[in-house]
C-alpha cells in the first residue's frame, strides 16, 4: 500500500498504524477504537509510553491522526 489518505473510523474499528522508518527502524502499533474513546493517544504510541489514556472522543482521534498525516509522521493507515 502506497500513499497517504485520511482515515475514516467507526466506533469499534481496529486500526493498524504504521509509522515511518526512523533511526531505530520501523515500528508498528495497534490502536483499538471503541466506546467512543480510545485506549492510547498517538503520542503515547509514538514514544512507547502507555499512560492513563485521555478521555477523548472519536472525532478528537480523527483530528489528531489527520494532523499527524499532514505533518508527515504517518506514512499510511490501514483499517482492517
Report each predicted region and the residues it spans.
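Mixed-charge, Lys/Arg-rich low-complexity intrinsically disordered regions
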Residues: 1-11
Amino acid at each position: 500500500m502506497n500513499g497517504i489518505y485520511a482515515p475514516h473510523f467507526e466506533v469499534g474499528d481496529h486500526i493498524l498504524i504504521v509509522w515511518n522508518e526512523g533511526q531505530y527502524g520501523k515500528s508498528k502499533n495497534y490502536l483499538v477504537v471503541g466506546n467512543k474513546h480510545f485506549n492510547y493517544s498517538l503520542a503515547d504510541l509514538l514514544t512507547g509510553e502507555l499512560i492513563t489514556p485521555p478521555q477523548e472522543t472519536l472525532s478528537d482521534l480523527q483530528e489528531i491522526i489527520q494532523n499527524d498525516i499532514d505533518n508527515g509522521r504517518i506514512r499510511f493507515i490501514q483499517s482492517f
